[in-house]
Amino acid sequence: MKESDSVEKRKVSMISLGCAKNLVDAEVMLGYLPQDRFEITTDEAQADIIIVNTCGFISDAKEESVETLLEAIEYKKSGNCTLLVVTGCLSQRYAEDMAKELPEVDILLGTGDVPRILELIEAHDRGEDVRQSVGLPQYLYDHTTPRVASSPFYSTYVKIAEGCNNLCSYCIIPQLRGPLRSRSIASVVAEVERLVAAGAQEVNLIAQDITAFGADRHDGASLEGLLRELVKISELRWLRLLYAYPDGISDELIELVATEEKICSYFDVPLQHIDDRVLARMNRRVGEDTIRDLIHRMRQRIPDLTLRTSFIVGFPGETDAEFAKLLAFVEEGHFDRVGVFRYSREEDTPAASLPDQVPEGVKKSRYNKLMKAQQRVSFRRNRALIGRVEPVLVEGYSEETELLLSGRSIRQAPDVDGQVYITAGQADVGQIVPLRITDSSEYDLIGEIVDESDE
């Protein structure tokens, strides 16, 4: 018998908060823990080690992270947990404060310390003081990095770059994640090939700004060049682009999305506002004319485009007139999906010191008005799809009822864009099938699987 066979494995529970980019970090971190010594569990009460991968982007995310940490501390007091590890953006930002305020936390890691997880657990086991182990955010994983999938086998995320050079005045991310660091095209292709071979039908490319991919490498790498290589992977079905900065969307990229069948006709382009004065204070590199021209070029070349964006309401100095302009812009109906954020005053950002901070009550009112306006737009755009046949990725039985299958159309990104409820027909989980849309709501679609032999 091997020595490792006689040692009881330690159970590890990973709680990952925030965005998909954070989820990839969590999967990589778990990959660094040898399977012959550690066993992953989703039951925190049974876990010997709990790792909380925090988000510290805005106030709501920080509050969720703190609440989750307090719950994990309770497991350490009353459950099996003997080691509590905190990593991610919140610990990168507030390691010193957290070390003082949360003595129950054994190890604090930053966003750049992912590959040190095993080293630090072993150091803690030896009695070394490794509570504050937050380093500079310089890490970047590649195709050789071990990774434990937590997403369904048929859909996955691939982080093509880390960090950001955009320096928007409201955003703390460059301080938490560091400057732009792009992977090589060969590395991304190798990872996607492996994931597709393991059954992935949908690959979602992510970064803080995917359009900046390659700008730091000085080897000619670009998002367009990467996509040309990825579409050569024969078994890949859907390739989705998430988080594209508007001034990085070239005509060449639009043409690729328009003509390459494997690239979803879907763009997620955070615009943040439409008023030039607000955009300038946000330190965005685009104005209203550029935004409108971009939307026109995208819609003209990709008639079937699904366009998602996000806006910030209540930015410092945003007047009633500036908000009214944003509201009218949304009501024009350009977008299939919109995420709205109330401005969060983040310390150590230029916007935090701007005059004319907007009261929380006004932010909330503007948020509600903008969301309601987009709900009406989304409802109309979804109703226009009734009668069409669309490809749908089947994800399993609905959370609402086991009588219905559910999935996502090619128009719906994971986690943020609603679902398709399948009222007739059968398919396997992970299968992409044609579906005729029979009904819709603001966010979801309803339809029946089409027998292709009858078409």
Curated annotation (Swiss-Prot):
Cofactor(s) this protein cannot do without: [4Fe-4S] cluster
Residues binding [4Fe-4S] cluster 1, per UniProt: C19, C55, C89
Gene Ontology biological process terms in this record: tRNA modification
EC number: 2.8.4.4
Source organism phylogeny: Bacteria, Pseudomonadati, Thermodesulfobacteriota, Desulfuromonadia, Desulfuromonadales
Cofactor remark: Binds 2 [4Fe-4S] clusters. One cluster is coordinated with 3 cysteines and an exchangeable S-adenosyl-L-methionine.
Keyword Oxidoreductase set for record: no
Family: Belongs to the methylthiotransferase family. RimO subfamily.
Pfam family name, one: UPF0004
Domain TRAM: start-end pairs: 383-451
Catalytic function, reaction form: L-aspartate(89)-[ribosomal protein uS12]-hydrogen + (sulfur carrier)-SH + AH2 + 2 S-adenosyl-L-methionine = 3-methylsulfanyl-L-aspartate(89)-[ribosomal protein uS12]-hydrogen + (sulfur carrier)-H + 5'-deoxyadenosine + L-methionine + A + S-adenosyl-L-homocysteine + 2 H(+)
Domain Radical SAM core per the UniProt entry, residue ranges: 150-380
Organism: Syntrophotalea carbinolica (strain DSM 2380 / NBRC 103641 / GraBd1) (Pelobacter carbinolicus)
Name of this chain's protein: Ribosomal protein uS12 methylthiotransferase RimO
Binding site for [4Fe-4S] cluster 2: C164, C168, C171
UniProt-listed PANTHER family: RIBOSOMAL PROTEIN S12 METHYLTHIOTRANSFERASE RIMO (PTHR43837), RIBOSOMAL PROTEIN US12 METHYLTHIOTRANSFERASE RIMO (PTHR43837:SF1)
Gene3D superfamilies according to UniProt: Methylthiotransferase, N-terminal domain, Nucleic acid-binding proteins, tm_1862 like domain
Primary location recorded for the protein, binned into one broad class: cytoplasm
Cellular compartment(s): Cytoplasm
Free-text function comment from the UniProt entry: Catalyzes the methylthiolation of an aspartic acid residue of ribosomal protein uS12.
Span of domain MTTase N-terminal: 10-126
Gene Ontology cellular component terms for the protein in this record: cytosol
InterPro entries: Elp3/MiaA/NifB-like_rSAM, Methylthiotransferase, Methylthiotransferase_CS, Methylthiotransferase_N, Methylthiotransferase_N_sf, NA-bd_OB-fold, Ribosomal_uS12_MeSTrfase_RimO, rSAM
GO MF annotations, alphabetized: 4 iron, 4 sulfur cluster binding; aspartic acid methylthiotransferase activity; metal ion binding; protein methylthiotransferase activity
